[in-house]
């Protein structure tokens, strides 16, 4: 495995009051617990409030985010961002390719069409060992990476919104 390099982002744009929705696919509970913990740790450290919604699988994540965004806006407590968390492990059929590609496409469509600060933490791997390499509780946790991405995108949105 190549050594990952994380960009050091020094953006200190104020994100006070930021609120995101985490939507997690509970298909692999133990791996999902680790991804969720990584995301929560990063959001808590940044002072970002969050709500958590659980769905059965990765394909349901984009729709659940869209539903959450609409409901939160209607209720007067809109989300500034979202964190998508899940795990898709390759099997013997093309289901892996479909779920991986379509969940990513759905998230990208949401992000672009709604200018949504989105962190994609849906890991797509060949086996359980690779999943744990990306979910373990350290600097490689992809749940934490997804939360950091959403936080940075919120900073960018706020910075560009300033007069």
Curated annotation (Swiss-Prot):
It is an enzyme of class 2 (transferase). It catalyses: (2S)-2-hydroxy-3-oxobutyl phosphate + 5-amino-6-(D-ribitylamino)uracil = 6,7-dimethyl-8-(1-D-ribityl)lumazine + phosphate + 2 H2O + H(+). It comes from the Bacteria. InterPro entries: LS, LS/RS, LS/RS_sf. Its EC number is 2.5.1.78. Pathway: Cofactor biosynthesis; riboflavin biosynthesis; riboflavin from 2-hydroxy-3-oxobutyl phosphate and 5-amino-6-(D-ribitylamino)uracil: step 1/2. (2S)-2-hydroxy-3-oxobutyl phosphate binds at residues 92-93, 134. The active site is at residue 95. Keywords: Riboflavin biosynthesis, Transferase. One of its GO terms (molecular function) is 6,7-dimethyl-8-ribityllumazine synthase activity. 5-amino-6-(D-ribitylamino)uracil binds at residues 27, 58-60, 87-89, 120. It holds the Pfam family DMRL_synthase. GO terms for cellular component: cytosol; riboflavin synthase complex. GO terms for biological process: riboflavin biosynthetic process. Belongs to the DMRL synthase family. NCBIfam families: lumazine-synth. PANTHER family: 6,7-DIMETHYL-8-RIBITYLLUMAZINE SYNTHASE, 6,7-DIMETHYL-8-RIBITYLLUMAZINE SYNTHASE DMRL SYNTHASE LUMAZINE SYNTHASE. HAMAP family: Lumazine_synth. Catalyzes the formation of 6,7-dimethyl-8-ribityllumazine by condensation of 5-amino-6-(D-ribitylamino)uracil with 3,4-dihydroxy-2-butanone 4-phosphate. This is the penultimate step in the biosynthesis of riboflavin. This is 6,7-dimethyl-8-ribityllumazine synthase. The gene is ribH.
